[in-house]
């Protein structure tokens, strides 16, 4: 056994010495194809967009150095980070992370959001006292993509990680939902949440057409477009920040195969453990219980004279388990299309069967304009509308409306590379659980800090 370990170590050292597993800095990870939306990949891109010039020059220089002198010691990245002296002008978390990214062949972002929300009406129809205002949501999400190796013979191996941590103070969004009488929610996470959204190892084979991924993931990462699938950078309301009728897991262990025959086509098929609904832990043991969810996904991303676009279809099925005691089938059709350099239009039609969620159909249409006056890359204007069908088998109030509509608009103003503020207005027309009211409103100010 000792001889085997010695031989294996010698072989690995030889591979690294001769550059077979040499890691060029900032190599593109084909696990997330460039033209196809992936929620956590977009977060990494957004975090690094402001420093693109720095990255390009640093990546070019580092790549040249690495080709001439491959890393020969496991502690070389640590030595190089210390040599860069990222804290020479005082403590700078951003500069330290940039240095770590460069030396470890990774991308790192930490997104922190503070979201106060005011709502009207202030109390539900049967309540005697008003709810406390505002609700304060604190949202932290670290994201890491680490490319382990990249070579013509071995392909690309990478590890991806994302975690979602939600806390509330003063009041919760769930109480606000009840007060204004909606079947949806005023944001993507109405209560305290701990979710391991992503922890996968992916192997992309030479040629970059076939990728196999193992680990914990969620379909939320691909089910959407640029601005209707992430509360931290786009719309806030439940029906505009995700698939409102989704019955799939927030994070579950499984595997999927991705086929990208040409850059504009992305096809996926995979399975997950059916028992993990909220994704609070990484539980491999559930795979032995023989209950799995399955999905198929197709995405087409044409590059036309109008601009880049993406059109995708997702279909999935979930099993009956104690945490979600109903079997469901769901679908989601998405499109996003640039009309010129600044204007982006998007839409979604989604639905699901069963009694797992309050809304079983939803239609979305909206538009957004990023950096409209070329002031700051984080500047963004957005307006959208969603009409959702209420599931009467789940929302069992005596009097409910069949449909609920939300119109939302926001304006994000960037301040430097790390901070943005976003005033936001939601107007709910005909709240489903308040037939006595014609509308309800929610006012928000989102403060984002990106590292």
Curated annotation (Swiss-Prot):
Upper lineage: Bacteria, Pseudomonadati, Chlamydiota, Chlamydiia, Chlamydiales
Coiled-coil features, chain-numbered ranges: none
A GO term from the CC aspect: cell outer membrane
Keyword Transport among record annotations: yes
Role: Facilitates L-arginine uptake, as part of the AaxABC system. The arginine uptake by the bacterium in the macrophage may be a virulence factor against the host innate immune response.
Gene Ontology MF annotations: porin activity
Subcellular location: Cell outer membrane
Residues making up the signal peptide according to the UniProt record: 1-27
Membrane topology reported for the UniProt record: Multi-pass membrane protein
The protein's name: Porin AaxA
Source organism, top-level taxon: Bacteria
Pfam families listed in its UniProt record: OprB
Family: Belongs to the OprB family.
